[in-house]
Amino acid sequence: MSEKKTGELDLTSAPIGKTMLNYAIPCIISLLVAALYNIVDQIYIGWGVGAEGNGATSIVFPLTVLALGIATMIGDGACSYVSISLGSGDKDRAHRTVGNAIVLTIICGIVLMLIYLIFMTPILRMFGATDTVSELTRNYAKRYFTWIAIGIPFYMFGQAMNPIIRSDGSPRVAMAATLAGAIANIILDPVAIFILKWDVMGAAVATVAGQVITAVISIVYLCKMKEITLSKISFKLKASLMKNFIPLGFTSFLSQFSLVLSMAAMNNMVSKYGALSRFGEGGTGDTPMAVVGIVMKFFQIMISVVVGMSAGCIPVSGFNYGAHRYDRVRELMRRLLTYEFLVGVVFLLIFEIFPVQLIKLFGNSYSQTYYDFAKVAFRIYLCAVPLDCVCKSSFIFLQSVGKPVQSTGLSLLREVVLAVPLVIILPWVFTQLFGSENGIYGILVSMPMAVVITFIVAVIIDLRMYRKLKALEGEENSIL
């Protein structure tokens, strides 16, 4: 059995609670800080540009999520495979995995940047920049997206390397890399928006500057890793190797990609039905579009905590699974799902009690209609978040122990099979039953309905996995 120490922590014997905290907290902070990139932009844009600017960032946001999905597919998959490889004592496979992940991330980042820049107008239209939002919002979206697209390779590299750095036993370095970029973004945002008067373009430039800093710090660390030594042969792409680690991160990609699909569908439905509702000021969907974008930002904050806690434990669960310490994997699973549910309860209370206070962080000079819709959106759309926390955690845990089929299946059910059809069908149903002005409520109900169904299936799969780990533990003890 291999042993791995991180500082003073031995992953096969240190207390599970302490080990979880050691890995999860830096990861949570890293992902929270990453989420702040978009949130800080939107806060400054809300105060310095207005609702049209916030609407523009809402249109662009799914496209950054798509880039994140590709990056996390490579990074989380490599992280899981590296941890399992180190747990079984195969360092050669570990360093080749890291090298392949680096090259693959760079290639994907450049290709995605070119696609975004070449096909910008039709892409933005696909994600909600239609005639039902104002021309000003559409123009802002184009200005913002141009610079965000240029920064995509740096953004993807920083996000993909973050879990790999954690798998090398340096969660604090991963956290510091992300934190440095976010601090730069927070400092540069007001300078670019309020002093240089660059409106939404300034927010995008500040974001890209922060992403470059994160990428540079990641490169510096990769040159002197602790557990892994990279060489020229590490960077030679090997199909058989990528075939093994990419499926382990496919759930991360699928989760983000399906979120992109549901957000694209949501943006278009909000634009259409928002303009028909009592919240559609001036006959446009600008107000509902801006509010839904902000609600999604707070949802992303919660998801950053949830995913951070789960992804931070990938090296711990993966290493112990590879080392046949099934008792520790089972205990980690039990604690993880419990903690995630409690996190969801805390966020639910915040969303239900303080919706107006939350929305006012993004500007306090909007109309009463704007705040009325914010209250409705927070309280309906996010009412099932404790169950969603358990679902998201289940996806990642199953991925970490080399169960991509179950993990991918759950993610597909949540985001593709349920979320996308429901966000399209329910507004039509509500329109037929209650009139065109109430179609917007069908959009808000779609998410909790998808979550409840997915939660039921996730509980069944989790219980089976828990029993399997217990059986494997018994087999291991009988051999010993």
Regions found by a protein language model. Name each.
Residues 1-24, 82-151, 195-250, 317-384, ...:
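Short alpha-helical transmembrane segments in multi-pass integral membrane proteins
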Residues 22-41, 147, 181, 210-214, ...:
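Transmembrane helical elements of multi-pass membrane transporters/channels
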Residues 28, 32, 36, 40, ...:
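Generic alpha-helical transmembrane segments of integral inner-membrane proteins
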Residues 32, 36-54, 124-135, 191-198, ...:
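Helix-terminus/linker motif at the lipid-water interface of multi-pass membrane proteins
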Residues 36-39, 48-51, 85-88, 167-168, ...:
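Helix-loop interface residues and adjacent transmembrane-helix termini in multi-pass membrane transporters
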Residues 51-62, 141, 145, 204, ...:
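Small-residue hotspots at the loop-to-helix junctions and early N-terminal turns
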Residues 54-114, 155-174, 289-355, 388-407, ...:
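Small-residue-rich hydrophobic transmembrane alpha-helices
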Residues 75, 147-166, 174-185, 203-216, ...:
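Short runs within selected transmembrane alpha-helices of multi-pass transporters and secretion channels
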